[in-house]
UniProtKB/Swiss-Prot annotation:
GO terms for cellular component: cyclin-dependent protein kinase holoenzyme complex; cytoplasm; nucleus. One of its GO terms (biological process) is G1/S transition of mitotic cell cycle. The gene is CYCD1-2. GO terms for molecular function: cyclin-dependent protein serine/threonine kinase regulator activity. This is Cyclin-D1-2.
Length: 354
């Protein structure tokens, strides 16, 4: 068994945190035989199979697969105080990766950046396969980044896949009405198949690292609000939400957007969508000031907007993500707004755990 994984620099309580991990993960069986699950991440993959044996399964019905990311409107009145409180809540680092994480990720080992990119792509594929809400994929990547900002996983391949599966499982439990089984989640391009117990233990590890704070503020929290500001008559709301959702999903590939808060990403995405659909909004500081939203960082939104325009116009992975997700939701644009359930088609055959 290898040495414990190295925690991210700057975390004074990381040693205590690892002790908590060991306590949580050893209570379900004798500590002498269980050992440290976090240490096991250094070694061979536990309880996995690369068997060619296959079985078929039908993807469960998506729970309200709507382009607004699952933040369904219930005649909510957006008061100045409510919006200001939401924007103020973004400053809580407990719901975001460590402030130094984006820089460390971009300047660190290329393998870490590549592993994150692979995990993001996998999460988006599974989200597409099961018709999950956009916010589910966004939260899964957010949980993954928050965990990685605190702990560095070994470069053995399977540990990162285990983290991605775990974060998507947690996000699905938070947002989806019908959650695919652990085995079904791993059917899409999975190199390893993990047992339910392994995923459960990793969930405890992630939950403790995130201080059990899973209900996070996301760009989808603000999507309808900003769309209403751009199109108060509601003539283009469906298209605005649909296009802004695709842009937002594309941003999770690009680590540059880790430097931007959810409200800035949401506002910039809506403005990008409006420039494509309506061609009416002139993007400048005055436009954003006219929204009269307390706490909104107009300059940050303009920077994020320009970055998004580069992302959309380029041929990088972000654009590919937009094209993939566009294909997914084109056929459900109408049902997205009406929040009707959409049943996914049966997925292809998959491997099963031996």
């Amino acid at each position: 068994m290898g040495a414990p994984a190295t925690a991210a620099s700057g975390g004074g309580d990381d040693d205590d945190r690892d002790v908590v991990f060991e306590y949580l993960l050893c209570t379900e069986e004798d500590a002498a035989s269980a050992g440290s699950f976090f240490q096991q991440l250094q070694g061979p993959a536990p309880a996995v199979s690369s068997s060619p044996s296959t079985t078929t399964a039908t993807a469960p019905a998506a729970a309200g697969s709507c382009d607004d990311g699952g933040e369904e409107e219930e005649e909510e009145v957006w008061t100045v105080d409510v919006v200001a409180e939401l924007i103020g809540g973004e400053a809580e680092r407990s719901h975001s990766p460590r402030a130094d994480y984006p820089g460390r990720l971009r300047s660190g080992r290329p393998a870490d950046l590549a592993a994150r990119a692979d995990s993001v792509a996998w999460i988006l594929k599974v989200r597409e396969l099961y018709g999950m809400l956009p916010v589910t994929a966004y939260l899964a990547v957010s949980y993954m980044d928050r965990f990685l900002s605190l702990h560095r996983l070994p470069g053995n391949g399977w540990a990162m896949q285990l983290l991605a599966v775990t974060c998507l499982s947690l996000a699905a439990k938070m947002e989806e009405t019908l959650v695919p089984s652990i085995l079904d989640l791993q059917m899409e391009d999975a190199r390893y198949i993990f047992e339910h117990r392994t995923i459960f233990r990793m969930e405890l590890l992630v939950l403790d690292a995130l201080d059990w704070r899973l209900r996070s503020i996301t760009p989808f929290t603000f999507m309808y609000l900003f769309a209403d500001k751009v199109d108060p008559n509601g003539k283009h709301i469906r298209e605005l939400i649909h296009q802004a959702t695709q842009v937002t999903l594309a941003t999770i590939h690009d680590t540059e957007f880790l430097d931007h808060c959810p409200s800035s990403i949401a506002a910039a995405a809506v403005l990008c969508a409006s420039s494509e659909i309506m061609q009416l909004v002139s993007i400048d500081h005055g436009t954003l000031v006219s929204w009269r939203i307390i706490g909104l960082d107009e300059e940050a939104i303009i920077r994020c907007y320009r970055l998004m325009q580069q992302l959309i116009s380029s041929n990088n992975v972000g654009r590919e993500s937009t094209e993939i997700t566009m294909a997914t939701t084109t056929t459900t644009a109408t049902t997205a707004v009406s929040s009707e359930e959409v049943v996914s088609s049966s997925p292809p055959s998959k491997r099963r755990k031996m």
